[in-house]
């Protein structure tokens, strides 16, 4: 039942492993499952051939990742020029935000399987006063920006937002974020953003 599912940890959440360029199914699985089953995991694929967009499309409270290979076939030795630094960088990015998947989930866009859609969601930790916004722009989208109305924020509080990719920070009030929304600009196709936020503490 739903109560049991909410306490389960499915290490492999579906028989359909989405390793397509757009990762539409992986995004849709996460969007749907986080409403009911907060702890789950799927595969991002092999770390020598995935992008940040692929990684972020597959992120959840758990993540399965391989170094290299070809399914169940016998595997050749890992080559000496394997991009270990790149693989480590991707894994460290995921580990740096994994804790937010134990927070409250809020979808910021509609559910869609369209190749030209954006999907975004918010993970909020009310006890800590912080959270994470995950934004995914699919390959077919011609749009370069979106305004996302955030949830569960105090209108009277100022929040600091840090873009993981650019390092740019900005401060906005909860009132601005829940009415006008958070502006996100993504120029590439596909593209993605990870944006951390925290309530500003008064000194």
Please place each PLM-identified region on the residue numbering.
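Catalytic cores of secreted or luminal carbohydrate-active enzymes
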Residues: 56-111
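Extended hydrophobic-aromatic, low-complexity segments
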Residues: 67-68, 142-146, 171
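C-terminal beta-strand-rich structural cap/linker in extracellular carbohydrate-active enzymes
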Residues: 172-203
